[in-house]
Amino acid sequence: LTQALCEKLEGRGKVAVLVGTPGAPCHEERALGVRSVIEQHPGMEIVELEYDEDTVEKAYAYTKQLLERHPDLAGIVCCNMSNPVGAARAVIEAGRQGQVVIVGMDHDQEALGYLRDGTIYALGVQDCYSIGFDTVQVAVMIADGVLPGEAYPEKTQETTTIVYQNGAADMLRTLYGVID
């Protein structure tokens, strides 16, 4: 996702990062990934990183503050499911659609609506079925006494699909039955 943002911004601009819960492994790993990608683009800078504790309201409030403190903010990377919604609401309220590029995680219905209308540039949609299936499968193995590394990896890699505006309607239809 961050690479998509960098390409959209042509490797230039100030970027903010919204993260969910401090210490949540997947949120922290995503934030580290954002940093590592941004570091590869000398014309880009992370100006702030904020934790919204997985609330749309805090993501919205932080984004409003970010837009006020950084009127030249070019992009926002959102590391969890609530960030993109809060960021999009604040960007719309500030009249900055098309000026601030938002990328984010997950498939919240409201976020997909913002993707469809172009407020959000791209979303990373996780394969929730596989995540659930793998979790139950590993839980059964653990209950049967199987140790990590024997029949299953200690950590699994799940699929994330990057969805852009042209794929938003299909994703809304598939996940939520929304038909335009």
Predicted regions and their residues:
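Glycine-rich beta-alpha junction loops
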Residues: V19-G23, M81-N83, D106-Q109, D127-Y129
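Extracytoplasmic substrate-binding proteins
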Residues: L1-L32, S36-V37, H41-G43, V47
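Short beta-strand elements at the ligand-binding edges of bilobed clamshell
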Residues: L1-A4, V17-V19, L49, D117-Y129
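Solvent-exposed, acidic/flexible segments
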Residues: A24-H27, D52, V56, V77-N80, ...
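Hydrophobic alpha-helical segments within soluble ligand-binding/sensing domains
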Residues: L1-V15, E29, K58-Y60, H107-A111, ...
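Hinge/cleft segment of the Venus flytrap/periplasmic-binding protein
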Residues: L18-P22, C26, V37, S130-D180
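Structured segments of extracytoplasmic/periplasmic soluble domains
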Residues: A4-K8, R12, V37-H41, Q65-R69, ...
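Hydrophobic alpha-helical
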Residues: G33-V34, V47-E48, D52-Y114
